[in-house]
Amino acid sequence: MSREQLVNRMLCSEAMLDAQKLRTGELDDNDWAELIRHMGPLSEAPIYIDDTPGVTPMEVRSKCRRLKVEKGLGLIVIDYLQLMSGNGRTDSRQQEISEISRSLKAIAREMEAPVIALSQLSRACEQRADHRPMLSDLRESGAIEQDADVVAFLYRDEYYFPDTEKKNMAELIIAKQRNGPTGTVDLTWMGQYTKFGNALKKF
């Protein structure tokens, strides 16, 4: 996803605007007012997006070091791990992903900042009756599971079963947490805003 696409998604999420309306330009006066109101704070937020394709862990480390010195660094997000490149010295893609995973762990320690790395899943969860992801579904390497302090999955029943009673609902599945419990957190899914929120409690 390009830098522009990410910024548009963040704008829609913050302003609670239908992403499709923004793409097509079908915004009314109220929509434009909300867009402008949220554009200022977002432009001033300390968020830096680098959409260079196929970066290596060494390049990520170098950019993070520079950013930490110049601006400060509180969080690093990789979207997504399998799009990164290794150093070219490994014999298989699985070994390359393992190397990338270990390198991101080292970057987190050096920068004293958490690294959130998105990852692809294998197709195994598509073939099960219960499509909820499991640790074994992490694609191309078991090293991701081993290196990560926390592994979390997102699941929406409506994606697989359109007639489900759990419409506009999602589950945040904490499958691994090195220093805490595992479990599932219910969320609300606002698809038109590409946004998750706290689940509404039923009384």
Q: What are the language-model segments listed below?
A:
Residues M1, L118-Q120:
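Conserved H-loop
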Residues M1-G72, G86, T184-T188:
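Cytosolic-facing regulatory segments adjacent to core modules
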Residues N8-M10, G88-T90, R128-D130, T164-E165:
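Short amphipathic alpha-helical segments
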Residues L22, N30, T56-L75, R102-E112, ...:
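C-terminal regions of RecA-like/P-loop NTPase motor modules
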Residues I49, D79, I116, D149, ...:
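Residue-level signature of catalytic and energy-coupling elements of molecular machines
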Residues D50-D51, A117-L118, L154-Y155:
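Conserved beta-strand segments of the P-loop GTPase G domain that flank and frequently precede/overlap
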Residues P53, Q82, L121-R123:
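Active-site-proximal loop/turn and secondary-structure-junction residues that shape catalytic pockets
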Residues L73-A117:
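Helical hairpin unit composed of two closely spaced alpha helices linked by a short loop
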